[in-house]
Amino acid sequence: MSVLLRSVTELCPVYSPFFGSMGITASIVFTVFGGAYGTAKSSVGISSVGVMKPEFIMRSLFPVVFAGVIGLYGLIVCIVLFINVNKSEYSLNRAFLDLGAGLTCGLCGLASGMSIGISGDCGVRGAAQQPKLFVSMLICLIFSEALALYGFIVALIMAATGDNSCVATASTSSSS
């Protein structure tokens, strides 16, 4: 009986929910930082374009919309990871996978938000002066958004895989 309790303690320590919670936090915090940066940086360009050409403001909102979607990716991953966290049946393996998933989604979202902000600001200003640049700006924004989408997909895969067993199996106990 003591071997079974020791195995359960080794596979599911009391501190494993901490790592899962850090993954949840990283997912939402970094994606929101990325979305906020993208929105703020693009808004500066939209404001300056609005002074020169007020009729171009509605077409200039694409970077803000793209940046807002990044926060949704983080929120969805946050909810999926939160469902995984359960103190009584939450293994250290699962906790590290959840931490990795949160960091993957969060940091990809942060990089994407920075890319959207910079390319959105320059793209909006350039498209206001030369309307032919509007399509180029949209393509740059789509590829910048894809960075966050890659992290989102990998985070969902990480959240769906892995072992959450707190009981040692024959393969686990024989390798020790």
Swiss-Prot record:
Lumenal side: 1-17, 84-98, 158-176
Highest rank taxon of the organism: Eukaryota
Main location: membrane
Record flagged with keyword Transmembrane helix: yes
Membrane topology of the entry: Multi-pass membrane protein
Keywords carried by this UniProt record: Hydrogen ion transport, Ion transport, Membrane, Transmembrane, Transmembrane helix, Transport, Vacuole
Record topological domains on the Cytoplasmic side: 39-62, 120-136
Coiled coil regions in record: none
Subcellular location: Vacuole membrane
Subunit structure and binding partners: V-ATPase is a heteromultimeric enzyme composed of a peripheral catalytic V1 complex (main components: subunits A, B, C, D, E, and F) attached to an integral membrane V0 proton pore complex (main component: the proteolipid protein; which is present as a hexamer that forms the proton-conducting pore).
Family of the protein in this entry: Belongs to the V-ATPase proteolipid subunit family.
Name of this protein: V-type proton ATPase 16 kDa proteolipid subunit
Gene name in the database record: VMA3
